[in-house]
A protein has these predicted regions:
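Noncatalytic alpha-helical scaffold of FAD-dependent oxidoreductases
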Residues: 1-469
C-alpha cells in the first residue's frame, strides 16, 4: 500500500488519494476494506476515462490482479476477473473459438471499468447489457463488515449492477455472455447527406459513420457479420489502418493542432486532403475483434460523447454542426448563434471527425442507452467529439463541451457518457434517467453509508440524503 499522485489517460483528472492499494486476491481485498473502513473508497481500472468517477481522497483500489478468465461449462458465458483488460479477454476467448457479442472502439479498458460505465460499440447493445452476474465486495448493511455478494437476474439489482459506476462496491468478477467467434465484412464510402448513410443501416447493421468537420461530408464505415473467410489482403488492410489511420492521420492532426496551430490549415486538411487519402470501397473480411477496434490510446486526447434517440438524430447532428461552426468563429442563421455566449464565439476549432454509432437500448437503469420511455424504446446514437489539444490549452474545448452537453440535454434529452467528459448535474440527470430513483434504492441497499461514492458522483447522480459530505 502506498500514496501516490494518480492521473487518467487524458491528464484532465489528477488527485492524490490517502492510500493506494493493489490487493492480490479476494481475501486480501476483504482485509483491506476491514482495516480501512473509515475511508471513502473508489476503484481505478485502466484510467481510460475522462470523468471524475475515479477521484477520491480516501482509499483507491486497483484490481489488476483479478484477471482470471474461465468459460462456463455450458460455453455460453465467461467468468472474468474485474481487472482483466478487454484485449486479454478477447485473446483468451479467441483461443477457444469464442467472442464477446460486441466490442468498444478500444480494448485497453478493463472488464469492470467498461461495463460499469456503459462502454459500447456500434449496432448492438452496450457491453453492460451482456452482463449476467456480478460478484461484488461491499459492507454488510447490518454488521458493517466487508462481505461478498453475487448479483444475478433477472432482477432490478442486476439491472443496476450492469452499469453501476462503482457505487455498489468493489467488483471482483463479472459473468458475461459470449458467442462463437465471427468475422466482419467492412468497406468505407463518402456521402453528401446523412440520409444516404443511414439508408445502408439495414444492410450493414454494425456500421459507424463520421461527420467530417468543415467539409461537412459524411464518411460511412459499413460493417456486417459474415460467414465469408478472412480476406487474403486482410493483413495489408490492417497495416494500412494501423499506419495510415492509427498513426498517420493522428500525427497529422497532432502537428496541425499542437504545433502549427493555424485554423485555416485544419480546415484545408478536412476539405481538400483527407478525402483523397482515405481508402474507399475496399471490401475486406477479418475477425470481429480486429475490425471493431482501433488504437485510440496512442495519442493523448479528451472526449465528450452525447447520446440521442433515433427520432432526434438528424436535428441533433445539425445543431452539433452549428455549434462547431459558432465556436469556430463562423456565423449561422439559426437561433443557436444567439444562444451561445458571444465570449465563446471563435474560441474552439474542432479538428477531428465526429463519430456516430448506433447502440440498441439496454436493460439497465442508468447506462446512457437505457430506455428513456418504456412505451417508446428507440435505438440510441452516440455522437463522439474528440479534442487533441495540449491539456493546458483545453479551455476552448471545455467551453464548447459544457455548452453542447447542456444544450443537447435540454433540446433532445441527450445523455452524456459517464466515462467521458460529463458536465451534466444531478438536476439534468434526474430528467434524463427515468429509473434513477430505482438505481439509488439499489445503491442504498449495497452501500447505505455512501462509502463507495465520491463528490462528483454525489453531485451528479445520488440524492441529497445519499450525498458524500
Amino acid at each position: 500500500m502506498t500514496t501516490k499522485q494518480v492521473h487518467n489517460f487524458g491528464n484532465n483528472v489528477r488527485f492524490t488519494p490517502a492510500m493506494y492499494a493493489e490487493p492480490a486476491d479476494e481475501a486480501g481485498l476483504l482485509k483491506l476494506l476491514e482495516d480501512h473502513n473509515d475511508l471513502s473508497i473508489r476503484v481505478i481500472a485502466s484510467g481510460h476515462a475522462w470523468s471524475d468517477a475515479i477521484k477520491t481522497d480516501g482509499l483507491l483500489i486497483n484490481v489488476k490482479h483479478f484477471n482470471e478468465v474461465r468459460i462456463s461449462p455450458q460455453g455460453d458465458s465467461v467468468y472474468v476477473g474485474a481487472g482483466c483488460q478487454i484485449k486479454c479477454l478477447a485473446a483468451a476467448l479467441a483461443e477457444q473459438g469464442k467472442s464477446l457479442p460486441t466490442s468498444g472502439l478500444i480494448d485497453e479498458q478493463t472488464v469492470a471499468g467498461a461495463t460499469a460505465t456503459g462502454t459500447h460499440g456500434s449496432g448492438k447493445n452496450s457491453l453492460s447489457q451482456y452482463v449476467r452476474s456480478v460478484r461484488v465486495v461491499h459492507f454488510d448493511k447490518e454488521t458493517g463488515t466487508p462481505k461478498v455478494s453475487t448479483i444475478t437476474g433477472p432482477s432490478v439489482e442486476l439491472s443496476a449492477a450492469r452499469c453501476s459506476l462503482g457505487l455498489l462496491g468493489v467488483i471482483v468478477e463479472v459473468e458475461m455472455e459470449i458467442r462463437p467467434a465471427y468475422n466482419i465484412l467492412e468497406y468505407s464510402a463518402r456521402y453528401q447527406t446523412l440520409d444516404q448513410v443511414v439508408a445502408l443501416e439495414h444492410e450493414y447493421p454494425l456500421q459507424q459513420f463520421y461527420l467530417m468537420p468543415w467539409s461537412w461530408h459524411w464518411f460511412g464505415q459499413h460493417r456486417k457479420e459474415t460467414t465469408q473467410a478472412r480476406s487474403k489482403l486482410a493483413g495489408l488492410y490492417r497495416v494500412y489502418w494501423h499506419v495510415g489511420i492509427d498513426w498517420g492521420l493522428h500525427l497529422v492532426i497532432f502537428a496541425l493542432v499542437k504545433l502549427m496551430r493555424v485554423k485555416s490549415l485544419i480546415r484545408f486538411f478536412f476539405k481538400r486532403v483527407l478525402p483523397l487519402v482515405v481508402a474507399k470501397n475496399w471490401r475486406v473480411v477479418d475477425s470481429s475483434q480486429k475490425m471493431l477496434t482501433m488504437e485510440h490510446e496512442i495519442f493523448r486526447h479528451i472526449e465528450i460523447e452525447v447520446f440521442v434517440r433515433r427520432s432526434d438524430l438528424k436535428n441533433a447532428l445539425e445543431e452539433v454542426k452549428q455549434t462547431i461552426q459558432v465556436f469556430g468563429g463562423e456565423a449561422v442563421s439559426s437561433d443557436l448563434q444567439q444562444q451561445i455566449p458571444k465570449s465563446d464565439h471563435g474560441t474552439y476549432q474542432h479538428h477531428y471527425p465526429i463519430c456516430i454509432r448506433r447502440v440498441l437500448a439496454d436493460e439497465t437503469l442508468v447506462s446512457m442507452t437505457s430506455p428513456s420511455n418504456e412505451k417508446d424504446i428507440q435505438d440510441w446514437y452516440a455522437i463522439s467529439l474528440i479534442c487533441f489539444e495540449w491539456p493546458s490549452c483545453r479551455h476552448g474545448f471545455f467551453g464548447f463541451a459544457n455548452f453542447l452537453a447542456s444544450h443537447m440535454a435540454t433540446r433532445f434529452h441527450a445523455r452524456s457518457h459517464w466515462g467521458k467528459y460529463n458536465p451534466l448535474d444531478r438536476q439534468a440527470n434526474q430528467q434524463l434517467y427515468p429509473r434513477l430513483d430505482e438505481f439509488r434504492s439499489v445503491v442504498q441497499k449495497f452501500d447505505p453509508e455512501s462509502r463507495f461514492a465520491n463528490e462528483w458522483l454525489s453531485n451528479v447522480i445520488l440524492s441529497d440524503a445519499d450525498r458524500v459530505a
